[in-house]
Amino acid sequence: MKNILKYLFLIVAAACLSGSSGTICAANQQSSASGNTTEALASKPLANDNAFNTVAYRSLPALTVGGKEGVSAPFAGMSKGSLLVAGGCNFPGKPAAEGGEKVFYRDIYELENPTSDKSNWKKAGQLPEALAYGVAVTVPEGLVCIGGTNGKESSAKVFLLKKQKGGIKCVNLPALPQALDNMAGAIGGGYIYVAGGQTNGRSSRAAYRLSYPHATSWERLPDIPGAARLQPAAAVQNNGVTNCFYLMGGFQPADASHPGFANTDGLVFNPQTKQWSRVAEIIPHGTKTPMTLVGAAALTSGCAHIIFVGGVNRDIFQQAINRPLAIAQAENALLQHPDDSATKGQLETLRNQQAEYMLHPAPWYCFNDELLIYHTITDTWVTESRSPLLARAGAALVGHDGEWIVVGGESKPGVRSADVTAIKMTMRPSFGWGNWTVLIAYLVAMILLGYYFMKREGDADDFFKGGGRIPWWAAGISIYATMLSAITYMAYPAKAYATDWTYYPMLVTILLVSFPVIKYYLPFFRRLNVTSAYEYLERRFNATTRLIASALFIIFMVARMALVLYLPSLALTAVTGIDLYICIILMALVTIVYCTMGGVEAVVWGDVVQGIILVGGALFAVGYLVFGTEGGVSGFLQLGSDAGKFRLFDWSFDYRSATFWVIILGGMANNLISYTSDQTVIQRYLTTKDERSARQSIMLNGLMSVFISIAFFAIGAGLYTFFKTHPAELDYTMLKGDTIFPFFMMSQLPQGLAGLLIAAIFAATMSTISSNINSVATALSVDFYKRWRPQASSEQTLKVARRTCIVSGAIGMGIALLMATWEILSLLDFFQEILGLLSSGLGGLFLMGIFFPRIGGKAALTGFLSGVCVVFLVKNLTPTSFLLYGFIGLVTSVLVGLIFSYIFKEEKNLKGLCWKQLDADNAK
């Protein structure tokens, strides 16, 4: 039986390894036929090349070390604008094919300003010892070098190379727990990760991370599952939720017990769960052949892609590492059966292949000459751009100034390349005259609407409350459009695309909150006939409380204006290429003109028009995405279900993430705050003719929030399934995840239709901004100006209100310009965080005023300030989810207010100012 197995092994080996000319990749076959390898490789287009990204290559000065060759497996990275390359190895004397000796180096080379055409390499220092095959990561201080080998033993040393006057300084960092070489590593999310490799020739499955720059020792992570991986490629990239460590490819060496193999899959380590999981097999979309990433290098691109450069051909490499084992097996079989001619023939063939392996020209080895791209959210692989400059293994890859710099590596086994190549991938945005026509027509129409209502205005009451002429259904749509904003239109689809539907129950809480708002809050605003919501706080508590609350509201509204100005500008920049700052300025100016002219009546009717555009655009997008997914409706449902995109609830009791309990508590609190203390919303309650109409408008908004919002989450799931089945249609350089929906509009929809959906984003923005500006003008005019000048006429108040519109809009625009420089992964999360931080205390004041008659002005202010302080402390000192900030602030304000009500006792006539008093009055 044993002999039969040996013969079977020989037959398989012969089939895999027969004929040195038989193992030739498709590209090499074409190049052999054409007689020009470089041109053949460079000219062949890739089926997956997309229409949105361009790839350009440029050569930097060549780097030769120890002779005429470059080096393989060096440490490389950036320090103060200079490219540093340290260590590495090559064969400076006799070629490897002739038995030459591999030499390891300790020299450090520097290329100042790699983007300049005039820079040249210079020797800048030396490593503590000669090393190669380690890990290098760039940090703000310089280049961190980890592990490696000197050719005799593995190293556990970790040190930082810093550029300074006089040369390169080497600073020791915490050493690895074990010596490692041929591993992979990356930095991201505050950690340096290392995994795989070997220790003095023995394969390792160990994984470690170092909290940089604070930790004094490495943390042991769970071992990588499956076999060990030598020479894998690694990167840290966001998966839509958190930064994860991706470990791709690599190989398991052959030994006496089993053949070696090159991995065609990858692993991902999630720091939140502290578990490894597998990613999709490395099969580029549209192909059927698995690839490996042995000897490849990796860097992140945009917010969710990883770019891989170089690496060996799986079949050729796997045959090479198994050939010695096949020879040994054949020799053993021949010892037992010396006269077996078949075995002799197989052995001779194997030995010839082994002898000839290092002698072939570089194209024969079929090193990967394409950019291999992985998308973390859809878990898909594509290839983009083919160039012979990419066909290297063991090269270093360094990111700098929007370019990826490939340094050295080997062009074939034993032969090092001195080439240094910069790769730049860019996005080709184009808006088109048809889209511009639709967008400009919409903007002009909104300005004309504002002008029309300006002509109808009679006094300040018309400007602030529309004279009570607004129908209930228009007020309801206006509330919905105001609270919707571009945040919902872009960020909710982006959130569902990257994660799932767990945020949807938060929108259901809007309907749940509508019932207590109608019963307990609305009567006060309507029956007291207030213009500003904060007038109630003065009547209930004191003037100080009113002024503080109004001032805080104004601050929050200006911050919100900035955010919702930034969002559509970000979208327009991503799809048209127009400068982000110009977009912000243009959007702000158009919105200021529109809402300043028409007052609240123009705002409300503008919201109605914009709401129709918003909803219509969303419903159309859902249909297009679902039917555009391969398999249509069934494909959409199947792919979305398999990926968990329709998950509604996370039942875990984790206060740090968006679990069901966090969503419900946070949603109830945040929406209660918005619908009971936000002048923008309350002002809509006051524009209707009576309290009954106001109740109907609130309920309509709640129902629209529940049912129409399904479309936004369906868009997110549809974006996932569409790009899952069309991964080459993505923009590989997309920097902000929130631009995925507008990118889809511009990349997939025809001219004009795309402009209409982009106009819907502007509609969402303008409805919110105009409402915010009008409400700020109302609060400032009524709560401050009228207080300082109680004898001011209606005309004077109207002038102040209009000037306030202009000034507040300009301030919001300025903050939006500043916000454009911030790193905000999810604008939805950022907005909810700001909402909780700035407005939770306001909701607490109204809650205390209406339901707790014993709480007076001093106690209420104490509770209010305590709530704000506690929320800031929770944010900075705990990992609590931002969704709970509003709930924490609300509860803290009320509890502290109750406690201090026993200290600050106040007597005041509360008739008509508390719920119990109002209920008693109604009963009479």
Please state what every model-predicted region is.
Residues A13, S32-F431:
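Kelch-like beta-propeller repeat domains
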Residues R428-K924:
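Membrane-embedded helix-loop-helix hairpins and adjacent transmembrane boundary segments
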Residues Y7-S20:
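Bacterial N-terminal signal peptides
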Residues M1-K6, R854:
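Positively charged n-region of N-terminal signal peptides that target proteins for export
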Residues G19-N36:
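Signal peptide processing junction and immediate N-terminal pro/mature segment
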